[in-house]
Amino acid sequence: MAVRLRLQRRGKPKRPYYRVVAIDQRAKRDGEPIEILGQYDPIAEDNKFKVNIERINYWLGIGAKASETVAALIKKNQTVEIKQ
């Protein structure tokens, strides 16, 4: 099973927030995640981005790949190297 770290949309129409999840890459965008790793609110004034770095490192360590968006958010907000 190939695992991806990607965003899962939540919220109301025109007021989204996102969960950072580990999910099978073949699953639907809003499918059942393997694990919820954090959250991202793009509408908040300070673009709140909170993740569990230990779990992200675990998933990346066992071969999961981060989506382009998640990789960019992590690089922008944290001191974690993302291997693509």
From Swiss-Prot:
Taxonomy, superkingdom: Bacteria
Keywords, ordered alphabetically: Ribonucleoprotein, Ribosomal protein
Pfam family, one: Ribosomal_S16
Keyword Ribonucleoprotein included in the entry's annotation: yes
A biological process term (GO) from this entry: translation
Classification via InterPro entries: Ribosomal_bS16, Ribosomal_bS16_dom_sf
Keyword flag Glycoprotein: no
Molecular functions (GO terms): structural constituent of ribosome
Gene Ontology CC, one term: cytoplasm
Family per similarity comment: Belongs to the bacterial ribosomal protein bS16 family.
NCBIfam families membership: S16
Cited PANTHER family: 30S RIBOSOMAL PROTEIN S16 (PTHR12919), SMALL RIBOSOMAL SUBUNIT PROTEIN BS16M (PTHR12919:SF20)
UniProt name for this protein: Small ribosomal subunit protein bS16
Organism encoding this protein: Endomicrobium trichonymphae
Taxonomic lineage of the native organism: Bacteria, Pseudomonadati, Elusimicrobiota, Endomicrobiia, Endomicrobiales
